[in-house]
């Protein structure tokens, strides 16, 4: 299977080869890895549980384990910062199973080459058929070969947020007792009877 969406560049693929076994041994899955250079070099790792719901403590554990392996392998020549995070609500879609898991939700998909005169597609995911990602666009449902994709991510919508909150609550990962109470009283400039 093509994993260019998980690790695009050659150095990213090398990082994935090194860190995937570590992450999988811990019970997690690699969603994406990127080595980004600029003023500073950052190795960004996105991981998740197979059923979703990675926590901050999980990210810290992954960071420690991956850091130890990278110290031994030493694949990055420059100093770098290691960032481990969840994929987030508007997560990248990097594996065929992601397109099945989020069927019905809105996504943006880009292809490496032109398909029917365009490279960008936005619409509701309609599942997977063999090695094709199905997406409902204005013109109808189309199939894009997974290997054609250069980028794909969920679009942040109210429905997606509600579903993620529902899943976290169902998994017991959302404790509403720690939320602040929100006051919905409206202040007005009209003086009350006692102010006159």
From Swiss-Prot:
Lineage: Bacteria, Pseudomonadati, Pseudomonadota, Alphaproteobacteria, Rhodobacterales
Superkingdom: Bacteria
Keyword tags: Cytoplasm, Ribosome biogenesis
A GO cellular component annotation in the UniProt record: cytosol
GO biological process, one term: ribosomal small subunit assembly
Compositional bias ranges of the Acidic residues kind: 177-196
Entry's localization field: Cytoplasm
Pfam families per UniProt: DUF150_C (PF17384), RimP_N (PF02576)
Function: Required for maturation of 30S ribosomal subunits.
Entry annotated with the keyword DNA-binding: no
Chain spans, region Disordered: 176-196
Major localization listed first in the record, in broad terms: cytoplasm
Family: Belongs to the RimP family.
Record protein name field: Ribosome maturation factor RimP
TM ranges: none
Gene3D superfamilies, alphabetized: Ribosome maturation factor RimP, C-terminal domain, RimP-like superfamily, N-terminal
InterPro entries xrefs: Ribosome_maturation_RimP, RimP_C, RimP_C_sf, RimP_N, RimP_N_sf
Keyword rRNA processing appears in the UniProt entry: no
SS bond list: none
CDD domains for this protein: YlxS_C
NCBIfam families membership: PRK00092.2-5
